């Protein structure tokens, strides 16, 4: 998994590529925790994510809870396979997905 981060005054955009699983989820969690900065909005661009495990879902849920307190979080460019996981687990109802 690779992570690229772009920051502006309004938002932090984290571009994720690869698999989000038990091996890579801690790196994503660390990036979210350390790189949000003062931004009130977090965008997770998932156009290159082909797979997400329960460990990845846990990271997204934690990020969502954190961002609800200070602003907003949305996921963009979610592929069909990952969207299927979100729908089966109920995360499609919890997360803002565009």
Question: Where do the model's predicted regions map?
Answer:
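Short leucine-rich amphipathic alpha-helices used at interfaces
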Residues: 2-3, 34
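Short acidic-hydrophobic, aromatic-tinged amphipathic segments that line or gate anion-handling sites
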Residues: 96-98
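Amphipathic alpha-helical interaction surfaces in cytosolic regulatory modules
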Residues: 22-94
């Amino acid at each position: 998994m690779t992570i690229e981060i772009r920051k502006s005054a309004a938002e932090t955009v984290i571009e994720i590529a690869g698999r989000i699983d038990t091996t890579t989820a801690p790196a994503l969690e660390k990036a979210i925790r350390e790189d949000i900065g003062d931004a009130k909005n977090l965008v997770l661009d998932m156009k290159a994510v082909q797979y997400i495990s329960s460990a990845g879902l846990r990271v997204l849920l934690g990020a969502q809870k954190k961002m609800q307190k200070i602003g907003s979080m949305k996921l963009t460019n979610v592929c069909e396979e990952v969207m299927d996981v979100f729908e089966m687990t109920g995360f499609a109802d919890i997360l803002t997905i565009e």
